[in-house]
Amino acid sequence: MHLNPAEKEKLQIFLASELLLRRKARGLKLNYPEAVAIITSFIMEGARDGKTVAMLMEEGKHVLTRDDVMEGVPEMIDDIQAEATFPDGTKLVTVHNPIS
């Protein structure tokens, strides 16, 4: 399998997210990079599923809650930006205040 750097990065984010969702299911609280990876993967997969930028911007705010992450993490993440592939091309999706 031959992947370019962007494809490798997307695959790494997806794999990290799958591992981290298992940790979350076991009740472990997520740290900063773990929370960012899960929300980023949610955005990228949502785009592949045909969701719009507006939908992902809103739904991205409900992927994780304060109870899912370590203390202080919500305050560290003002917004998350992810480049996602939509049916009509690649777009930048920004989720403001993603952890409520």
Curated annotation (Swiss-Prot):
A single GO cellular-component term from the record reads: cytoplasm
In terms of HAMAP family, this protein maps to: Urease_gamma
Please cite one Gene Ontology biological process associated with this protein.
urea catabolic process
> According to its UniProt record, which reaction does this protein catalyse?
urea + 2 H2O + H(+) = hydrogencarbonate + 2 NH4(+)
- The identity of this protein, by name, is Urease subunit gamma
Q: Which InterPro entries match?
A: Urease_gamma, Urease_gamma/gamma-beta_su, Urease_gamma_sf, Urease_subunit
What are the record keywords, sorted?
A: Cytoplasm, Formylation, Hydrolase
Protein encoded by which gene: ureA
Repeat listed as a keyword: no
What quaternary arrangement does the UniProt entry report?
A: Heterotrimer of UreA (gamma), UreB (beta) and UreC (alpha) subunits. Three heterotrimers associate to form the active enzyme.
Organism, by scientific name, is: Sporosarcina pasteurii
Q: Do you know which Gene3D superfamilies this protein is assigned to?
A: Urease, gamma-like subunit (3.30.280.10)
Description of post-translational modifications = Although not discussed in the published references, Met-1 is represented in the submitted PDB entries as being modified by either a formyl, a carboxyl, or an acetyl group. The N-terminal is probably N-(dihydroxymethyl)methionine, the hydrated form of N-formylmethionine.
Query: What is stated as this protein's family in its record?
Result: Belongs to the urease gamma subunit family.
State its Enzyme Commission number(s): 3.5.1.5
Q: Enumerate the Pfam families for this protein.
A: Urease_gamma
- Gene Ontology MF, one: nickel cation binding
> Which subcellular locations apply to this protein?
Cytoplasm
The pathway it acts in is: Nitrogen metabolism; urea degradation; CO(2) and NH(3) from urea (urease route): step 1/1
